[in-house]
Amino acid sequence: MKQKYLFIASMALAGCGSMSESNKYWIQYKDIDQSVKEVSFWSREQFHSPSDVKGTVYQRDNLTHLATSTPLGEIYHIYDVNHIPMNVIFLDTKTQRSLNPQNAQDMAQLSKATQFDFYEFGKGRIAHAVFSAKTGLCQDFKSKRGVALKMATNYYTDASYKGYYVSVIHAIIRHNGQHTDFAYTPAFSIADTKALAMTQALEKQDGERVAQMNLKEKVTLLTNIVCQ
């Protein structure tokens, strides 16, 4: 299957680098329900094609021990418009099975599901989105009903991934790019006062615009990958 491409919305924060070397570390993020969680990345030593599993993400509640962590899902790659690979998880909410975005059968299965979780790691951010439909994802996406989207995107302010700004959005999205019931809420977890002030100023200037771009990004995720 050909590579799948996705437009990326990003904030111009300081630490927008790769998370490829974070295997041994736990990174904190705030989820859609505002609970604080931590994730760690364990890469596969060998994979033979671009469509192979690249690794596994483990998750735990904030400040608990490794023994209580559980596998969140398997990492696959999709590609942005610059052909840069993105670390993602497509998780069927009902079965809790990780699905391969490069596998036509997996995407056909997902297209008929009523809900799935999407995670993205890298480019200085961690995002978790939940897509929900009443009858089927792609059927509703291409109809007036649309698909309910709720998402939290954590943008990290430096390479240590200690401070972050969170963009929480809710909306109904549709195949034609139109959306309704849009709501955007910012949150901050930044100890350094100067970094907090800078990030709050940036959010005030660009936060809602980037949130709208995130909606367009998730529309392309369904259009180009799940419902093509």
UniProtKB/Swiss-Prot annotation:
To P.multocida PM0015. The lineage of its organism: Bacteria, Pseudomonadati, Pseudomonadota, Gammaproteobacteria, Pasteurellales. It is a lipid-anchor. This is Uncharacterized lipoprotein PM1509. It is found in: Cell membrane. Its main location: membrane. The keyword Membrane applies. It comes from Pasteurella multocida (strain Pm70). A lipid is attached at residue 16 (N-palmitoyl cysteine). GO terms for cellular component: plasma membrane.
